[in-house]
Curated annotation (Swiss-Prot):
Cellular localisation: Cell inner membrane
Signal peptide feature range: none
Topology feature Cytoplasmic, residues: 1-23
InterPro entries assigned to the protein according to its UniProt record, in alphabetical order: SecYEG/CpoB_TPR, TPR-like_helical_dom_sf, YfgM
Species this chain originates from: Escherichia coli (strain K12)
Effect recorded for residue 17 to A: Does not affect degradation by FtsH
A Pfam family the protein falls into: TPR_21
Protein's recorded name: Ancillary SecYEG translocon subunit
Topology feature Periplasmic, residues: 44-206
Amino acid sequence: MEIYENENDQVEAVKRFFAENGKALAVGVILGVGALIGWRYWNSHQVDSARSASLAYQNAVTAVSEGKPDSIPAAEKFAAENKNTYGALASLELAQQFVDKNELEKAAAQLQQGLADTSDENLKAVINLRLARVQVQLKQADAALKTLDTIKGEGWAAIVADLRGEALLSKGDKQGARSAWEAGVKSDVTPALSEMMQMKINNLSI
């Protein structure tokens, strides 16, 4: 760092700085202004895109929930074309529709697509929980257990424990199921879920 003896030295240093860097500063200012304009345009474009995606998502899922003709293919098209949170949410809605129709393979595929479309950890956790539940129904217990292993965070511990118990029980591992449910009961769990897991533990003894 340069040390100055008096105010004149500081003034001279400033003069030298602008003499040596004036052109670079001017270019920097121009680039900075250009970048600012570019950023504002990009930001405005992003807001408009998000607004359009939100509206299209609402229209798609509303049509699906109302059972309108061709609403499922239209929602599938929306989910496939929107590699973002809205696409992932559409995949969740579609997966539920497929589960209701007992088209479990389609539901699993739609959930896996949704996972690839979002970076939001909470949404990923929800999708993985749904996927694990579908995998248990498909008798894919090992796949369900692997899916559950990807879900992190204390807030999900009880629900994960409940599903883990179901997956293990479907494999005939009663002790593993008991351990999972006992861990779930001891976690930060709602009274209703705790009571349900305790009931499952009690049923193992019957």
